[in-house]
Structures are given as structure tokens and as C-alpha cells.
Amino acid sequence: MFIAVLFTLWLAASAMAGEFTGPVVGVLAGDTIEVLHKKHPERIRLSGIDCPEKGQPFEEKAKHATSALVIGKEVTVQMHGKDKDRHTLAEVVLSDGTNVSKMLVAGGWCWWYPKYAQQNRELKRLESEARAGKRGLWADPYPVPPWEWQKWRKRP
């Protein structure tokens, strides 16, 4: 019985990690895309970053930047698990090796998300460079990170 439980847990963990390749068929937000996987669109949350939320300044520009980078292109999805909304959390890489999260941070369209990518020093460096260059949302003198913006919106 114990071995059966361990095997089931191992299978579940294996299903959350892994890799697949497919075309990007949709961009739902700056940090959320849909990739065709086994003939069905799978919602993918780009790991390590957080883009402006719906209604937040630069939300549409971040979504457009993501679309320009990935829509219709073949990508490799390196899955890391699920986010709080049960969407697949993953690194997404274009066929030429370009990491989508890194490109969005470098362009100034999102924040490095230290809560979930604290060890990713490259994202931190890319964000610092985008800030210094006032690229994307860093042109705003007081950009508000999505996690702070959500807290502010929830206040009565």
C-alpha cells in the first residue's frame, strides 16, 4: 500500500515537471500564454515574472510585447509545476533559444518576481538595466508592482 501511494505521488510530480513543444495560439496577458499541447491549448504562466494586471498602467503594452514575441511561434515549454490558479508554471523558450521571460524583463514590460524566483539573479540584473534605461513601464516615475496594486485594489 505504501509503495502504491509513493508511486502515485511520483507520477503526479512527474506530470507537473517536464517539457513539450508547440505553437503559441494565444496571449491572455503579458505573463500568460496558451500553447497547443496534444491538440488542446494549455494555459502557461511565465515563471519568474509578473506583468501589469488588467486595468493597470502598461497592461496592454505588456500584452502586446508578449504577443509580438511569441504569437504563432513554436516554443519549448519547460514546466515547473502549477501556480495558485492551477495554471502550468513554466520557462518558455523560442526555437532560437530566446527565453521569453528574460526578453520581457529586459524590455521593461514586467517585474522580476522575487517571491517565486528569488534565486534568478539574471532576471534581477535585467530588471535593474531596464529600470536604469527607463524602458517600458520604467518610463513611469512611480510604477506599482502587480502584487502591490492588487493589495491596494482589495482595500475597502
Named regions from a protein language model:
Residues 2-156:
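Small beta-barrel nucleic-acid-binding modules, primarily SNase/OB-fold domains
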